[in-house]
């Protein structure tokens, strides 16, 4: 029992509830015994004030703009690490040694192929199907192809499933893209790094030699790092909730992908890019700023503000730098969308309206420009998000399975429907 406690009083009933402290961050009130003591539940739509679990993986301080993975700042990981190193960190809790990194890279690399029957599985989808619809179906179907790693009580099978998904997700994502545009699938090339392999599978064709640009590969790798995990967001909570029932890991990740597909979650970078295109030029920005400030105008600035961050999203600063590097490498330094983005950012950081409402640029503000420059259509943006977030989902799922306090998720509700009433025969209604 915690030494600290909180007392909740309602009418003549009160409850003494333990207060739990994490290693950093705010304390939480443990309400597990609230109903037993008071016959009341709590009401928190959207879980804005509710901690659903303990976790050692990711920490966010939204007020200060801090994002830590296993204690390491995202800025340091993105600057000095690579994606598979971050994957190892999220899964195992520590940065790997040189030998551990080489072994982990090898194990991931040699799971990149998918079962050959998967290629025929794709033909069941329409050619114009959204790639995210294809991703949901294919990832969910992995349990039918790899049922030797679905026993969640076996730590070895859990780790094999984890490595398989990290390795195969780029292959499946590239296959979804190729199927969507009518080009033949490109098999993985295991002497390439993770990001380079993915870019090659997306953009190579059999009739031409494709050489991956190292600047673009590094940018892709950094995008993967920045999207690897973000604590208990909607899709991660979905993965945990599905996993709490004992569902196999492939089904849980498919559930996360489905949740991520929602425009309020994974589609924000596409919306931000569309907004920049709608504004078009710098001289039109004042008009749209006025619209954004008008509460009666439906227009909203996309790529600004965040559910958690009330300060500058630390990932946005890294993404801004990456965007400049990509556009410079491709000879698009004067890209009009970037000019609009830079001026919008300047205004948001100096205008009292945006400062007061804490509407700072977030990662989606720049990632859409970068992905467009890399050659991806907007329909692939959320697919890339899902690819990168897979390791975070897996790490969170594994942590949940190993948590002795975890039980099947069963939220309560505030019922506002009809009270008890008697059935009336249809002839008398």
Curated annotation (Swiss-Prot):
Chain segments annotated as coiled-coil in the UniProt record: none
Source organism superkingdom: Bacteria
Catalytic residues (positions): 306, 364
EC number: 2.3.3.16
UniProt KW DNA repair keyword: no
InterPro entries according to UniProt: Citrate_synth-like_lrg_a-sub, Citrate_synth-like_sm_a-sub, Citrate_synthase, Citrate_synthase_AS, Citrate_synthase_bac-typ, Citrate_synthase_sf, Citrate_synthase_typ-I
Keyword Transferase among record annotations: yes
GO molecular function: citrate (Si)-synthase activity
Record's GO cellular component terms: cytoplasm
Catalytic reaction annotation: oxaloacetate + acetyl-CoA + H2O = citrate + CoA + H(+)
Gene3D superfamilies in the record: 2.20.28.60, Citrate Synthase, domain 1, Cytochrome P450-Terp, domain 2
PROSITE patterns linked: CITRATE_SYNTHASE
First and last residue of the signal peptide: none
Biological processes annotated in GO: tricarboxylic acid cycle
The protein's annotated pathway: Carbohydrate metabolism; tricarboxylic acid cycle; isocitrate from oxaloacetate: step 1/2
Keyword terms of this UniProt record: Transferase, Tricarboxylic acid cycle
NCBIfam families: cit_synth_I, PRK05614.1
PANTHER family given in the database record: CITRATE SYNTHASE
Family note: Belongs to the citrate synthase family.
Identification of the protein by name: Citrate synthase
